[in-house]
Amino acid sequence: MTQFVIDNGGIMGQFIKAGKVNDVMTNSGISKVKDDDKSLYRVESIYEGSSNYSLVNDVPTVSSYYSITSGNISETMESLENSDIFTAVWTKDLSRRTGLMELAGVKYYLKRGSGIDLTSVPYGYKLKDTLETKAEDENNDNVYLYENSLALPLVYGYDNYMKKSDWDSLDSYDKENAMLQIAVVQDDMNGELKERTPSCNSVVVVNKKKFMSKLKKMKLPNMKVKGDKITVKSGMVKIPISFKGIANSETHLNIKGIDYNHFSDEYVKEKLKASDISQDERSDVIYNKRVDNFYLGGIINDKYAGFNYCTKYYIYNGAKSTLCNYGYNKNSLKEAYFYMSSPGVYTFDDIKIVCQPMDNYKKYVKKLKLNIKNLEIEHNKISYNAKLNNKKLICTAVPYSKGWSAKIDGKPAKIIKTNGMYMGVVAPKGNHKIEYSYVTPGLGLGSALSLAGWLVTISLFIIFRRKKNTN
């Protein structure tokens, strides 16, 4: 078996020799985590080559590529404008966004590379170890293993809530910050918990007007900016954006309402007739109509924080907005890059650079932490003991499904879809045993119908057999 990559010209550009695939796909960092820590947690591994590396390495991660992915997950990821989603069923990771990783129960973060780029390490993660692994070219590569010093378990609790309809009106970076403070639920909780508005302290450091002004001043030979329309004539455009960031912040490039169009037929004809067109531009003009997906977004310290935009001609997931993470910086960030990798015509409803200060982060995480013991996940069951100082909505960071049922101290409890994709139950003050069990929705009815079908088939067989013998 050979794993390979085909470039735009239909030429094999990268391959892994048969028999070597497992060496490349098996992550030595994950192996060490599994050996050293037997508790329950998730891992995020950036720049992994395989889609379902969690299955290969037998460890829970935040990456998934399944055709049966819950719509709750894909819809929430799109609402949060996660830049690392690709089609509705493929979430590569959580794009190093500290809050999302915290709420998903991520305890360890791994990155490959020849150097430690601190901007690709989320807030609160400390270097634990440096290991050696195999790169895709079969040479040795480094894996840096980080541990979340503020890690929440897969179970945490809220004192307050907000309705999802109110949450939907927030910007994606404020949505993430809101979930660190209060639970997001679908409906009014009728007095079980107090409704509250989250505190949002994000700061827009470059708005669309300033951003477009910076693009116009660049005067690149392969880019033209007219009004809000950006035309990339050929190749890739990489533009430095200088700004005054905020210290102790996670910085994001937020692009909303992405609209991409191929070159018009008139433009193509005009360009191909021109005598001064370069060979590279000619190739890009000819190939442009075949572009169905490409990257655009941010670059920081030569690390790409891009979004894989899909046109309507590809496996389109409908996402037209993205939040690209420039990373956490202890000092204020002064410059980052914006890039568009495909020739064509771009417009954006909004494009801005936003800083999310982490000043209150430790306080939020501390408040979410519960006294949880004996947390166990086995097959279709989850159980744990919780000691609560007051009434809480206890969130379990496992994907919500109608197939789950819950009990508190042996009595049935209502499951509340929490934060768009997780499960929650409301429990009063005191010591409690929380249990979840899962049965595939429709399994009982399906089994009954299958059994009925077999009984009918057998009955008909017996009837026809008797008639035949009688005749």
Where are these regions (language model features)?
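Conserved luminal/periplasmic juxtamembrane motif of membrane-embedded glycan-processing enzymes
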Residues: 1-219, 234-235, 290-350, 354-360
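Active-site-proximal, structured, solvent-exposed surfaces of multi-pass membrane proteins
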Residues: 202-471
